[in-house]
């Protein structure tokens, strides 16, 4: 698992994000199958859900035991319930606000990888390594890492 031995939570976050990007670049068909357009009418068998969530658990791990150094926007109602459910599913003692923020970070991360992998930043971004690293660090800031 990328970043397991990294000295800080931020370094683990960086390593795991970079690992996801590297894997996607080396395995674009598999990435597209897992994270691309869903097949209409397809429902994944229940026994595939645990393996499918491993990447999310790995990306969430750097937050374990870290107290957010950022001001959390309060979430209420269904969004708070979603955040609490997500934190419980990950086995992380995160407040709902932090879990919701983590989900937004995942959405951004997978968006960055997908846009690059499928050529949607062609002629816009000339240095994808720097662009990706910049946004990974911005997400780390947002997560309080």
Regions found by a protein language model. Name each.
Residues 1-30, 49-56:
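Hydrophobic alpha-helical connector segments
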Residues 57-145:
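C-terminal peripheral helix-coil segments that are non-catalytic and often amphipathic
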Residues 36-48:
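Solvent-exposed, charged amphipathic helical/linker segments at domain boundaries
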Residues 3-10, 42, 121-125:
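Short, surface-exposed loop/turn segments at secondary-structure junctions
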Residues 1-5, 35-38, 116-120:
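Secondary-structure edge/capping motif, primarily at the C-terminal ends of alpha-helices
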């Amino acid at each position: 698992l990328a970043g397991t031995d990294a000295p800080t939570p931020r370094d683990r976050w960086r390593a795991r994000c970079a690992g996801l990007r590297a894997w996607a670049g080396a395995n674009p068909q598999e990435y597209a199958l897992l994270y691309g357009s869903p097949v209409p009418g397809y429902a994944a068998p229940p026994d595939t859900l645990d393996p499918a969530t491993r990447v999310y658990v790995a990306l969430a791990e750097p937050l374990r035991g870290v107290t957010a150094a950022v001001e959390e926007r309060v979430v209420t109602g269904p969004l708070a319930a979603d955040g609490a459910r997500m934190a419980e599913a990950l086995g992380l003692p995160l407040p709902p606000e932090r879990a919701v923020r983590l989900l937004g970070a995942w959405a951004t991360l997978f968006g960055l990888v997908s846009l690059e992998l499928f050529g949607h930043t062609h002629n816009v971004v000339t240095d994808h390594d720097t662009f990706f690293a910049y946004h990974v660090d911005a997400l780390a800031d947002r997560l309080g890492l």
